């Protein structure tokens, strides 16, 4: 992520718009890049790489930038794969975090996989392998939708 402060993402006055990507090296192979978070939010969980949309960015620009920053990969966003809301409450019931996340199905087009400090690990996995991992809520459904939408494009 760039210079946006993480403090403004805790106890936000409104939902925060974010993007992520189910990145495929080869759509026929079906393996998708799954990463494990090295810090909050979702510390230690497997998920899709991505991050917050910055003011003035389109969703596609944001997902390309975030993936490059977090993984070193160049991608081509192909199609939206649904949406997800992540709402986390603290012990007093106050909303600590509220993200609206728009995941893309994307094609890897270049770059070498180099993780930044936000990520602890990355794996290219088949969707069926996700059930063995501790993942963010809804990850398997998002990856499944990404696969379906890619297949529908032919």
Q: What positions do the PLM features span?
A:
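Conserved N-terminal beta-strand and adjoining loop/helix that marks the start
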Residues: 2-32, 83, 105-107
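A generic structural micro-feature
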Residues: 11-15, 45, 94-100, 119
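Conserved beta-strand segments that form the floor/walls of ligand-binding pockets within enzyme
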Residues: 18, 47, 103, 124
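Short loop segments at secondary-structure junctions
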Residues: 25-29, 38, 107-112, 127-129
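Conserved Nudix-box catalytic region and its N-terminal flanking loop in Nudix hydrolases
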Residues: 29-70
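Active-site segment of metal-dependent pyrophosphate-handling enzymes
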Residues: 72-110
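Nudix hydrolase/Nudix homology domain
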Residues: 112-154
